[in-house]
Amino acid sequence: MRHYETMFIVKPTLTPEEIVEKINFYKEAIIKNGGEICATQDMGMRNLAYEINKNKRGYYFVVYFKSAPSLVIELERLYRINEDILRFIVIKYESKKEQNAWNTMVDKVNKKAEAPKSAPVAAPETAPVAPEATPEA
């Protein structure tokens, strides 16, 4: 199995539920076609470098996965036929050096995803209550 990274940009006009639905669709497509998702990174809504189809913003999402080369062909086909995807890219990591870089990126993304969950929650501080002023006669 080869190492891949894909990033796609979803139209900003979709509702948050529709965006999650699109993301899950592509994650399921990777799994259904024999791929193994190693990490995902939700980059959120960002400004585009230039306007694409009259959109100045887009919702970015990155998936790191391992699969056979045939999956990439199917994934690109699914990206192309969906009008809600503004842009996409699939990057293949071939050499040992590139695969080590891929492993490092996957580790960073997984650590970043775990960090907020393990952080202790601080108790909110209460402001001191000021004594009420009594009216003078």
Curated annotation (Swiss-Prot):
GO terms for biological process: translation. Residues 119-137 have a biased composition (Low complexity). Keywords: Ribonucleoprotein, Ribosomal protein, RNA-binding, rRNA-binding. InterPro entries: Ribosomal_bS6, Ribosomal_bS6_CS, Ribosomal_bS6_sf, Ribosomal_S6_plastid/chlpt, Transl_elong_EF1B/ribsomal_bS6. The keyword Heme does not apply. Pfam families: Ribosomal_S6. Signal peptide: none annotated. Residues 113-137 are annotated as: Disordered. GO terms for cellular component: cytosolic small ribosomal subunit. The keyword Membrane does not apply. One of its GO terms (molecular function) is small ribosomal subunit rRNA binding. HAMAP family: Ribosomal_bS6. Binds together with bS18 to 16S ribosomal RNA. Belongs to the bacterial ribosomal protein bS6 family. This is Small ribosomal subunit protein bS6. It comes from Wolinella succinogenes (strain ATCC 29543 / DSM 1740 / CCUG 13145 / JCM 31913 / LMG 7466 / NCTC 11488 / FDC 602W). The lineage of its organism: Bacteria, Pseudomonadati, Campylobacterota, Epsilonproteobacteria, Campylobacterales. The gene is rpsF.
